[in-house]
Amino acid sequence: MAKISKRRQAFAAKVDRQKLYAIEDALSLVKECASAKFDESIDVAVQLGIDAKKSDQVVRGSVVLPAGTGKSVRVAVFAQGEKAEQARAAGAEIVGMEDLAEQIKAGQMDFDIVIASPDTMRIVGTLGQILGPRGLMPNPKVGTVTPDVATAVKNAKAGQVQFRVDKAGIIHATIGRASFEPTALRSNLSALIEALQKAKPATSKGVYLRKIALSSTMGVGVRVDHATLAAQ
């Protein structure tokens, strides 16, 4: 534990916590700090200019990251008939109806995301207390309740991430792994920021994107000058 602390302190000394770094410099620093023995995730925190206490200013959605997430995702789908076949063909590991619901109630949840066809919500709705706290409850706002289950499965497999503002008005998301090239991380971050811009509440006033900070799993936060992110 002491070694981790010393390593973190060494990297923290390299980062000016008050400085806004150009995106290329920020990514370079974050990747340098990601020196653990595993492939650390690269995470972003975005402070939004919204009042998270107001229901009309809750920012939520999803985006497919162009370079993927670097993570293998297991998908469960509630569907029947032709839609069930389409889900399987798209790569879903688990497809079912009442049988899948019973597995979930029994604690068998070997999946990372749940997708549901609208006609199955009578079944899925009974699982809210189980799936909700785990962040797995299907929701049309993030594209996991949809008649086009095949596309939803493909998106999940391709690197779709869901985002939702927390009580402090901050969005947290993973945009890749330390092993990713800087260009891949930048394209993923750009896609996320674009999705956040599109999700901006009409009632939000003033500066919307207030702060952007990058970090690795074991690293320190590096603030980003998002004007450099927009520059090509």
Swiss-Prot record:
Keyword rRNA-binding: yes
GO cellular component terms listed in the entry, alphabetical order: cytosolic large ribosomal subunit
Annotated SUPFAM superfamilies: Ribosomal protein L1
Gene Ontology biological process: regulation of translation; translation
Recorded family membership: Belongs to the universal ribosomal protein uL1 family.
Role summary: Binds directly to 23S rRNA. The L1 stalk is quite mobile in the ribosome, and is involved in E site tRNA release.
The protein's name: Large ribosomal subunit protein uL1
Source organism: Burkholderia cenocepacia (strain HI2424)
